[in-house]
Regions:
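Glycan-recognition and processing domains
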Residues: 1-26, 55-58, 93-105
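Extracellular carbohydrate recognition and processing domains
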Residues: 55-77
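Short, surface-exposed beta-strand/strand-loop-strand elements in extracellular ectodomains
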Residues: 40-54
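Residues marking helix boundaries in flexible regions
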Residues: 10, 36, 61, 71-73, ...
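Short proline/glycine-enriched turn/loop motifs at strand-loop junctions of beta-rich domains
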Residues: 37-43, 86-89
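Extracellular and analogous surface-interaction loops
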Residues: 20-31, 37, 70-76
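Secondary-structure transition/turn motif
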Residues: 24, 48-49, 86-87
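Noncatalytic modules at the cell exterior or secretory-pathway interfaces
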Residues: 30-32, 73-90
């Protein structure tokens, strides 16, 4: 994989957490995760964590419509984040400093 690319995302509904759980792996640089929901309902991120525990630096920016952006800062250890959402997304897109990759669930 080339420098700056974003790897695939995994996601599934987790009954124990009562949340949609997604794992994001970003190889290098700052990364953004954009989430689109099935309707214009409110997205709630129940928690975000890294391999070392809670990730308090998750910055959420609301866009127009049902889209949300989460920035994964370059200081995030291992460039890995697991997020817990209150709704299952219909689309997840990635952007980073080296390009754009799209994954559909």
């Amino acid at each position: 994989m080339r420098n700056g690319e974003v790897t695939t995302i995994n996601g599934a509904w987790n009954e124990e957490s009562n949340a949609w759980v997604s794992e994001i792996w970003c190889l290098t640089g700052d990364c953004w995760l954009e989430i689109t929901l099935p309707d214009k309902g409110r997205l709630v991120i129940k928690k975000a964590e890294t391999l070392d525990g809670p990730w308090p630096k998750a910055k959420i920016t609301t866009w127009t419509g049902p889209e949300f952006r989460i920035r994964i800062y370059g200081s995030t250890k291992y460039r890995y984040v697991r997020i817990y959402l209150t709704e299952e997304p219909v689309r997840i897109q990635f952007a980073n400093t080296k390009g754009y990759a799209v994954r559909s669930l």
